[in-house]
C-alpha cells in the first residue's frame, strides 16, 4: 500500500517520495496497516498542500515488539502549537486525527516542526494485535 501510494504521489505531484519498509506490508495486522496508511496519507497531503514539500520520506523499522515509523518532509515547516490551536478553532482535524489513530492502537505520536525546517513525525506502535 505505501509503495503504491508513494508512486502515485511522485507521478501526480512530482515530489520525491521515499519509502523504506523492512518487510512486506501485508504481514502486518490489517488494523495497524490501515491506520498507518491513513496517517502517512494525511502527513503527505499536509506536506504537499501546506508545506510545499519537494521530498517526503517514510522509514519503518521493527524491534522489541514494536513498530517505529518516521515521516519527514523538506517543506516550509510550521509552529506546531499555533497550528494545533488554529486547527481546533477552525474545526480542522488532520493532525488530531493522525494522533488519535495512533493512540487508538496504544502507540505514541510526536510531531516536530519549525518554520523553515520541514516536519518530522515519529510514531511507535506495539506489534501485538489481530490481523
Model-based region annotation:
Residues 1-131:
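Coiled-coil dimerization/phosphotransfer module
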Amino acid at each position: 500500500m505505501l509503495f503504491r501510494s508513494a508512486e502515485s504521489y511522485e507521478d501526480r505531484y512530482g515530489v520525491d517520495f521515499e519509502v523504506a519498509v523492512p518487510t512486506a506490508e501485508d504481514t502486518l495486522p490489517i488494523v495497524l496497516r490501515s491506520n498507518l496508511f491513513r496517517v502517512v496519507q494525511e502527513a503527505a497531503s499536509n506536506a504537499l498542500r501546506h508545506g510545499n514539500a519537494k521530498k517526503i520520506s517514510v522509514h519503518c523499522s521493527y524491534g522489541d515488539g514494536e513498530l517505529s515509523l518516521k515521516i519527514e518532509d523538506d517543506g516550509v515547516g510550521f509552529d506546531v502549537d499555533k497550528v494545533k490551536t488554529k486547527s481546533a478553532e477552525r474545526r480542522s482535524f488532520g493532525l488530531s486525527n493522525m494522533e488519535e489513530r495512533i493512540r487508538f492502537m496504544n502507540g505514541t505520536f510526536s510531531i516536530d516542526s519549525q518554520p523553515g525546517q520541514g516536519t518530522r513525525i515519529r510514531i511507535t506502535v506495539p506489534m501485538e494485535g489481530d490481523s
